[in-house]
Amino acid sequence: MNKQNNYSDDSIQVLEGLEAVRKRPGMYIGSTDKRGLHHLVYEIVDNSVDEVLNGYGNEIDVTINKDGSISIEDNGRGMPTGIHKSGKPTVEVIFTVLHAGGKFGQGGYKTSGGLHGVGASVVNALSEWLEVEIHRDGNIYHQSFKNGGSPSSGLVKKGKTKKTGTKVTFKPDDTIFKASTSFNFDVLSERLQESAFLLKNLKITLNDLRSGKERQEHYHYEEGIKEFVSYVNEGKEVLHDVATFSGEANGIEVDVAFQYNDQYSESILSFVNNVRTKDGGTHEVGFKTAMTRVFNDYARRINELKTKDKNLDGNDIREGLTAVVSVRIPEELLQFEGQTKSKLGTSEARSAVDSVVADKLPFYLEEKGQLSKSLVKKAIKAQQAREAARKAREDARSGKKNKRKDTLLSGKLTPAQSKNTEKNELYLVEGDSAGGSAKLGRDRKFQAILPLRGKVINTEKARLEDIFKNEEINTIIHTIGAGVGTDFKIEDSNYNRVIIMTDADTDGAHIQVLLLTFFFKYMKPLVQADRVFIALPPLYKLEKGKGKTKRVEYAWTDEELNKLQKELGKGFTLQRYKGLGEMNPEQLWETTMNPETRTLIRVQVEDEVRSSKRVTTLMGDKVQPRREWIEKHVEFGMQEDQSILDNSEVQVLENDQFDEEEI
């Protein structure tokens, strides 16, 4: 990288003030839930990654401290410690003025994940306290802040050093992050591991010093994104070794790695200056366009596609593909769509990636002739399967019209009276008996009931054409009415929420997993929009007394049960619910369907790589990885079933009191 870039006090450029951050934190970090909390860490880590990205330093240490604060330390150049042109110490400017940083000037960084990066100042604004320690020019400097960004000390010189780098320690403000200020090791782990995959020379250490949670992990990958693709494909049957190529065009560096597996869905992970672009963008478009064009040219050259044959569709070519596309774009060309970094808008990136892939991929296909021919045949089979499923797809897309009538006539769906798709809810209910209670107990205005009577197919192992043959899944597709797979359009959904309601036993849990696998693989935008939920019926019913003095209570956990038992004293009757059908309509409404009193679990995808790997482990063909995961993560005891509430990763929402910034 360009080491002549001048990272000095004058390269820090002030764009605007910081006043609104504490008042409207969601505008700056997306939310104040678990995602927003961890986003604070990523902002500081990304500053350290920018140093490595530009050739300065190669180590980042992240430590969750005993008191719940977190430290991020690098061995880069260290923040500038002089006086800024505004008259304040530069460190104070960086931590108290929004959008103040080297990435906004012309000189601090050649490339960065910046532009909309809110950085250190927002982290400071949303912290109870923050401290920064800088090793630079042979000296150690220190400054502290408190109460959401107010300096509690000036920049002071503490001693001498032979090191360089920056260490930032902060404790999130619990008046902002009211749900929790506790950092999740696994959530941080996935993001930090990702950064290490993308920069070959980067070494990252993650420590947890909290009592009872002590843990340490190291991430360093000498083969970079090649190892990243292998990691994503773990547990899958791969068809060849990982292919990699890189190049430069239009001043943009391009790195690509890919590998095909025997499954039917694609997984493309794209990055810009080490920042994940989960909504894709121009670089991803360039990759897909070039790959489609090169594969079609090759298929015709080897005569697998005749003159009269239609070109292969990109979706067919990418069936079973896992790829990582990473680009590094100079600051002056960097452009994202919207206020987040989730979608790249730089037009030059499309032609750059297209150029590199179009230049390198043909040589790879020629060199691996036998493999390439089999990949072309695989794509042709996918095309034939897509054509076979086309009619069913179009039926699913028009689910609101013709097929909706068929579904209603079949007697399966009990629709809501309202046509307001923004408020309507669809309950997917296990079994006819529970479905009957749900129909009688629901609020007819906005709640629709779809009983699931037959076997739900495992969509992890099935092609789309086979999925359409499964009556239960087909009915769900038509009922939701927004299409499926690449045709799915969330804006066409008939329902704002899809709620899975099953018995609290192993069969019910299995149905939940099968349905979640389907939604994750074929209606992913619904999950990403936080619109898929799991209903949580009570496990116990307690009754005491008769007539007017009769008291009925419900418990969702063993802890609640113990509390109620002590509260009620002797003489109560206890019922352990094994199935939804054991509740009458009134009880089902009051405990599980009434928005005022019910408890829902919102299904969220924290990280698609981890989620995809977990689905493959639990629902794929290979038995050994599944056995190992179960032995590691599941505790077997005398109880028949374990409450889903025992899972610390589950986010429980009681009484439908949703944080507006979460929805």
Curated annotation (Swiss-Prot):
EC number in record:
5.6.2.2
What GO biological process terms does the UniProt entry carry, in alphabetical order? chromosome segregation; DNA topological change
Which reactions does this protein catalyse?
ATP-dependent breakage, passage and rejoining of double-stranded DNA
This chain's function reads: Topoisomerase IV is essential for chromosome segregation. It relaxes supercoiled DNA. Performs the decatenation events required during the replication of a circular DNA molecule.
- Region Disordered: which residues? 386-416
* Similarity comment text for this entry: Belongs to the type II topoisomerase family. ParE type 2 subfamily.
Superkingdom of this entry's organism? Bacteria
Annotated site, Interaction with DNA, chain positions: K455, N458, H510, R626
Quaternary structure annotation from Swiss-Prot or TrEMBL: Heterotetramer composed of ParC and ParE.
Which GO molecular function annotation, any one, does this entry have?
DNA negative supercoiling activity
UniProt binding sites for Mg(2+) 1: E430, D503
Q: Output this protein's name.
A: DNA topoisomerase 4 subunit B
Where are the membrane-spanning stretches?
A: none
Which keywords does UniProt give here?
ATP-binding, DNA-binding, Isomerase, Magnesium, Metal-binding, Nucleotide-binding, Topoisomerase
